[in-house]
């Protein structure tokens, strides 16, 4: 029986991080966690990491699509945070962001790691951006690294 599992070391990988500016007080912590993880665990050099900023979570799929279309990157890490308000806007933003990023991954056959927080409160966002509940940016970076290695093994 063959088992394919990816490790996280990917020292030659080129990674794009697409990040929303909206709720930047949360997102910058996610970005720090992602970059630290790529460098420490993935052994990815800083010159192989590109950060692309966009206005909000709804714009992340289009930015990710343009990045994927260049074929310069081995994976994309998407980062942002959507905090529930008093209107259905939250549901639309979360749904479209999630579907759009998944579509990019499948359309361009590139890992697009989902590090977009979808939370009810600011406290929940803070917890997931490096305090009690870990750092979801770091977790997304780990996922991207593992997927690079899994896909590489499948193709070899």
From Swiss-Prot:
Family: Belongs to the DMRL synthase family.
Binding site for (2S)-2-hydroxy-3-oxobutyl phosphate: 86-87, 128
InterPro entries: LS, LS/RS, LS/RS_sf
Source organism of the structure: Aliivibrio fischeri (strain ATCC 700601 / ES114)
CDD domains for this protein: Lumazine_synthase-I
Gene Ontology annotations of biological process type: riboflavin biosynthetic process
Enzyme Commission designation: 2.5.1.78
Function: Catalyzes the formation of 6,7-dimethyl-8-ribityllumazine by condensation of 5-amino-6-(D-ribitylamino)uracil with 3,4-dihydroxy-2-butanone 4-phosphate. This is the penultimate step in the biosynthesis of riboflavin.
Catalyzed reactions per annotation: (2S)-2-hydroxy-3-oxobutyl phosphate + 5-amino-6-(D-ribitylamino)uracil = 6,7-dimethyl-8-(1-D-ribityl)lumazine + phosphate + 2 H2O + H(+)
PANTHER family associated with the record: 6,7-DIMETHYL-8-RIBITYLLUMAZINE SYNTHASE, 6,7-DIMETHYL-8-RIBITYLLUMAZINE SYNTHASE DMRL SYNTHASE LUMAZINE SYNTHASE
Keywords: Riboflavin biosynthesis, Transferase
GO cellular component terms listed in the entry, alphabetical order: cytosol; riboflavin synthase complex
Pathway: Cofactor biosynthesis; riboflavin biosynthesis; riboflavin from 2-hydroxy-3-oxobutyl phosphate and 5-amino-6-(D-ribitylamino)uracil: step 1/2
Name used for this protein in its record: 6,7-dimethyl-8-ribityllumazine synthase
Binding partners and assembly: Forms an icosahedral capsid composed of 60 subunits, arranged as a dodecamer of pentamers.
Leader sequence residues: none
